[in-house]
């Protein structure tokens, strides 16, 4: 195999390993943010995977058009009104600049090789005043920090998560990456669903009656940023 063929095969394998889906709590968090911000217009689901979030967003009847893009083929149950593009998201996307009012990306950036290139791509694809919402593992939770201390890696970046998860980001990394791409300072929202170290099926929220939440007690975070009007 050539280097390009080998890389393509590696990326496809990583995509297959990931399964192309996220948790219901993450999808719900996206829906809540979209409703709170009253976002409308043309939406891009960047890294749409098996289309679970794409289909849920369509049922909201908020958007004039929805486009899904992923290395995976178009799911058979995707509505014909949704445009689907099969594309390796590590590569430059051949879409016109300023095509979308909203970009969502659920648990995708940690799968990609160059988050800075991705942020620049998002910025170019958004219209002025457009909104970016993406999620990624929260590497600053107690569960993840303890894993780093005891095992030498964040909890979502163990050998069992590889080669799907390859890019671990902290809030400071995200702030810098988005700033370099000229986005507004990001806001962070936490899913408030988080496993207890060594007992991941037990959640802090259940144990504490919902009192424990936020950065130390959430497995995932959402990032909200805007493209300035000028």
Model-derived segments and spans:
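Acceptor-substrate binding/catalytic loop of class I
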Residues: 156-173
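A SAM-dependent methyltransferase catalytic signature shared across enzymes that methylate proteins
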Residues: 172-189
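Short catalytic micro-motifs in class I SAM-dependent methyltransferases
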Residues: 106-111
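Conserved beta-strand signature within the Rossmann-like core of class I S-adenosyl-L-methionine
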Residues: 130-136
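Conserved N-terminal segment of class I S-adenosyl-L-methionine
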Residues: 1-98, 102-104, 116-119, 134, ...
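Short, flexible, mixed-charge acidic loops at enzyme active sites
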Residues: 145-153, 198-202
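A structural helix-start
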Residues: 112-116, 136, 140
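A short glycine-rich, Lys/Arg-flanked "PGG" loop and its adjoining helix->strand segment in the class I
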Residues: 116-128
């Amino acid at each position: 195999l050539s280097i390009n063929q080998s890389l393509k095969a590696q990326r496809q394998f990583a995509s297959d390993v990931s399964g192309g889906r996220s948790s219901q709590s993450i999808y719900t968090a996206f829906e809540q943010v979209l409703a709170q911000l009253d976002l409308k217009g043309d939406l891009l689901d960047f890294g749409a995977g098996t289309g679970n979030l794409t289909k849920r967003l369509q049922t909201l009847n908020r958007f004039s058009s929805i486009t899904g893009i992923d290395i995976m083929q178009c799911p058979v149950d995707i509505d014909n009104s949704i445009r689907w593009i099969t594309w390796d998201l590590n590569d430059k996307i051949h879409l016109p600049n300023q095509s979308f009012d909203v970009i969502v990306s659920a648990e995708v950036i940690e799968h990609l090789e160059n988050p800075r290139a991705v942020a620049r791509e998002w910025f170019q694809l958004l219209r002025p005043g457009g909104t970016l919402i993406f999620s990624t593992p929260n590497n600053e939770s107690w569960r993840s920090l303890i894993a780093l201390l005891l095992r030498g890696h964040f909890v979502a970046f163990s050998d069992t998560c590889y080669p799907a998860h390859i890019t671990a980001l902290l809030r400071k990394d995200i702030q810098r990456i988005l700033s370099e791409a000229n986005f507004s300072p990001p806001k962070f929202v936490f899913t408030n669903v988080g496993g207890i170290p060594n007992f991941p099926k037990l959640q802090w929220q259940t144990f504490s009656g919902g009192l424990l939440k936020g950065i130390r007690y959430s497995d995932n975070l959402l990032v909200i940023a805007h493209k300035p009007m000028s």
